[in-house]
Structures are given as C-alpha cells and as structure tokens.
C-alpha cells in the first residue's frame, strides 16, 4: 500500500492583510509543485489539534507597533503558553516560521521570534531557519519571502521526496492554471427589490459586512459619526510640513473616550476616480449586489448570501475597495495576466508576477504608489471579472489617529493633530495620503458626517496621582496635549502629580506645534512648570549647526528625570517609528546607568524592561 499524499498546513495571523497575502502565496506555490496546502487563520484553527499535524506546518505572522501581535493570534498564543503542555507536546511536528515586520521598530519581528522559540520549546522540529520579512527591504517582505520559500521546498524534498514527487522546482506553468475567486457576486434586478430606508450607519455596516477577509469582522458598523468644526494649519507657510489641528463634534450619539485613546476614520474616496474605475471595469454603478464567500466542497454560504440585503455597486466600491490610493499586490498582476488579450501585455504581467520580475514590479508599482485604476489603465486589454476585483483590490481601511483632546477639557468634542501626507515619487509624480488630504480639503461649514471607531491605543490613561515623563516630538505631541489639558482641569479641584514634557521639531519659528498651549502651562504655577515639579523642554533640530533631538534634552535633564522615575513616574513616548523610540530608550538607559553608579547598559535595559512590564514605559509609534 502506497504512502498517503503529503500535505502542507499554513497558519497565519494578519492585522493588515500582508501576512494573509504571504500565507496564500506560500499555499499557491506549494500546490503548483504538487503539494496540497490548507491556509487557515490562527483564530479559526483548533490549536489543541496541532500535535496531530505530523506533516509540515508553516506559520506566517506579522508584528505590529512595538512588538504587538495581531488580534487573531492572541488566543492561539495564550494556548501555546499553557504550562501543562510539556517539552514533547509537539515532538511529531515539523515547522517553519515566516515573520513580517519593520526593522525601523525596536521589536522587529518580535512575534515571529517568540513563536519560533515557543514551538521549539514544545518539542517541534524546525524545517529551516525562520524567515524575517522587512518592510524596509527595497522589495518589501517579498525580498525575503522568495528565497526563503525556495529553501523551504528544497529542504522538504530532502526530508521526504514524497512532498514533491516531480521535484521541488517543477511547477505547473502559470498560464495553465488559475484559481477560482474566493467570493461570489450576485446581481439583483432592481425592480424586484423592496425599498428600504437605511441610515448611513446601516449602509456602511452592510457594505463592510460583505467585504472580503476578516479585517472588519468586529467593526463593520461605525461607533458614531463626527462632523468637522475646525480646520487650522499649525505650521507656518515656510515650513516643509503641513500639520493641521482638526476639531469635531459628535453627530446624533456621543461616545465616551479617555485620553490616550485612538480614533479611526473611514476616508471618502474621490467620486470621479471611483466612477472612472467602475467604467474601466465595464460595470453598472447603479446595479445592486450581494457579496459572499464562494461555495466549496466542505461548506455552503448560499443561506448567508440570501439573508444579505443588496447594496448598490458604487456604494460597495466607495466604502470597501481602495481604488484611489492603495497599490495592488503581486497576485493582482498574476491574475491580470490571465485576462490580458494583448500578447505583449500578458508577457509583461507574467514577468511582473515572477520572482525574476520582482524588483521591476516594485519600481513600477510600490515605489510609484500606482493605484488600481492607474494599473488597469496601463494594461487596456485586461478585463478582470468583478468577483476577482472584490478579492484582489486592497480593502479601504480606516486610518488611526491619536486623540489630542481631553473629554474633561473638551466635552462633546474630539481633536486630532494630523500631518498632511504628500510626497514626490522617483518619476516626479506628486502623491497624497488619502485620509489626511481629504480631511485637509474639508471646510467646517460642510455637512460631511465622518464614520469613526474608537479604541484603546498603546498609551493607557494615567491616574492624576501618577507622575509623568512625556516624550512627543512632532505630531507625537498629540496625545500629550490631551494629557496636559485633562490634568489641568483635575488640578482645579484636587492635587495632581507633576509632569515633564520633552517636545521636538525642526524649527522653532515654523514647526512649533501648539506653542502657546505648552508655554502657557510651563509658566509659574502651570502644569508643566518646574515649580510644580515638572518641566517643558524643547529640541529644535535644525536651528543650529549641530542637530539637537529630544534624546539629547532628556540626557541634559538626567538628574530631574531620575528623581521623577524614583518617585514612581511613568514614561510615555509617542511619534515616528523610525529611530526615535530606540534613541529615546537609549537615553533613558544612559540615565539609569549613570544615576545608579555607572552600572552597565544591560542592567539599565533590564531595569527599563521591568518598567514596561508594570505599565510604566509606554510607546505609541507610527510610520
């Protein structure tokens, strides 16, 4: 009796969709080599069954923020941490880990690294060294994924040739196989639809509830709507940046929030671009559709689609498909090649989708930040069916911002501090951030209701008795404006702990965000006054020949910082995710080392890690 067919299990944990894309690509590449593969999210997998997967298991996990794991990974990870599992629980399992992260962050690919160690501790055997995809790589995470996959296939073949009966490098040609789209679109005759009066919230919930993937499963319906009441430029005309102060009021319902919370806004797409996309795809914007997973051998979703209320196609595109700003992923070009009728377009698309064309695709697509519409216009012979477009067009994602107001100081209002994103591509094309440029274009008198979701960020609201050391260069000052405003209100009726704040920007005269606010609180008797035990310290990096940053100012105030830490202060850091968080941490390590009598950096690092574990060192960084 012959040996049973080998299989590959690919488990992924994704927050933004990149890990899902990578996992599906691994699954597709395995099947093209004759190895059946199942691709499953960690939150849909029975973790207790993992020891029974004696064949190969590949884990694809992303790391977000400062070493945070995706929401879909948390329950899976808690299960693996159970002490009763023992060192031999996974002794039959062979595994490989591929991580997606950004080396600009201090805890680069932290989730993949800790998963790899835990699997090994539980007795599993690694197939190959873990792969670490890096957003900073010229080709993104795929720059690491391509050679890592090649090594994976060849190592599996060495372990057991049954994995690839024809060899690890023999693939079914791309032009001979095409997957079925995962989603099915039903078009409805308008005359058969019953008219329903729906609120904006219901329409958004309906559209995003049909949207592919698990990215929106817990937040299809907005928490509420906001209306802009103020749009103020904070930077001077001479500045190289455009930073705005926005104020909003609640529409119909009010949501309670705390300082340090984050609000996500769903931006509006340019209606003319949406119309052009729909026309380019040969679709009727007024048609009504329902969207649902395609039926498979093991499951039927027809009942789910029957219970859905149809939605207008244009509304669905506007609310769920980012056709105006996001660049398509590599798989989009592969599917395009199947539908190209012009031979030269087909060849170009196949090249872009191949490992050999990866760098050229990156230069054409990601570096230029080409939109879906621009790519489709560059290949006019391609006519992709709408079910494929629903699957492949990047989802329209809410954009997250740190709230810069306090509910105590600014009742029934939400304030945001937003840098308006704009850049020039290598081919000298001006590109703008979708959400920030849209917000900048709004006038307070416009009746635009913005759908929003509130949630906790990485900066927990501090009690008024907790001393604070705040570090917020640039727009990193946003959450701390709320912190200071709230503590100033609290101080009117009861004692509050002191606050030190370190702010930085390029130029004092052009980029000093909220200057009057900070300086008023730094005066005698103010929340940031040294007389109250606090302080306000500024670093203007370009105002002198030698650049000065917040970490330099922190070191200058070494004694006062240490005294406040000894009094139980918590450190809060917010701002750019590039070098700043690491440089600030290094400054605190120097202070701890110096003030404790010249101890080593390693001892200081452990001391600060203890602060992190007890919630006294918090970082919120963004790219």
Swiss-Prot record:
Please list the disulfide bridges. Answer: none
Q: Which InterPro entries match?
A: CysJ-like_FAD-binding, FAD-bd_FR_type, Flavdoxin-like, Flavodoxin/NO_synth, Flavoprot_Pyr_Nucl_cyt_Rdtase, Flavoprotein-like_sf, FNR_nucleotide-bd, NADPH_Cyt_P450_Rdtase_alpha
The residues the record assigns to binding NADP(+) are: 475, 541-542, 547-551, 583
Q: Where does FMN bind?
A: 14-19, 62-65, 135
Q: Which residues bind FAD?
A: 369, 399-402, 433-436, 622
Which UniProt keywords are present, listed alphabetically?
Cytoplasm, FAD, Flavoprotein, FMN, NADP, Nucleus, Oxidoreductase
Q: Taking every annotated instance into account, which residue ranges of this chain make up the domain Flavodoxin-like?
A: 8-153
Catalyzes what? 2 oxidized [2Fe-2S]-[protein] + NADPH = 2 reduced [2Fe-2S]-[protein] + NADP(+) + H(+)
Q: What EC identifiers does the entry list?
A: 1.18.1.-
Kindly report the protein's main subcellular placement as a broad class: cytoplasm
State the needed cofactors, names only: FAD; FMN
Where does the record say this protein resides? Cytoplasm; Nucleus
Q: Name one GO biological process term.
A: embryo development ending in seed dormancy
What Gene Ontology terms describe where this protein resides (cellular component)?
cytoplasm; nucleus
What Pfam family is a match, any one?
Flavodoxin_1
Q: What phenotype has been reported when the gene encoding this protein is knocked out?
A: Embryonic lethality when homozygous. Embryo development arrested at 2 to 4-cell stages.
Family in the record: Belongs to the NADPH-dependent diflavin oxidoreductase NDOR1 family. In the N-terminal section; belongs to the flavodoxin family.
Q: Cross-referenced HAMAP family, in alphabetical order?
A: NDOR1
Subunit organization: Interacts with At5g18400.
Q: What does this protein do?
A: NADPH-dependent reductase which is a central component of the cytosolic iron-sulfur (Fe-S) protein assembly (CIA) machinery. Transfers electrons from NADPH via its FAD and FMN prosthetic groups to the [2Fe-2S] cluster of the anamorsin/DRE2 homolog, another key component of the CIA machinery. In turn, this reduced cluster provides electrons for assembly of cytosolic iron-sulfur cluster proteins. Catalyzes the NADP-dependent reduction of cytochrome c, but not cytochrome P450 in vitro. Required for embryo development.
According to UniProt, the name of this protein is: NADPH-dependent diflavin oxidoreductase 1
Query: Lineage, please?
Result: Eukaryota, Viridiplantae, Streptophyta, Embryophyta, Tracheophyta
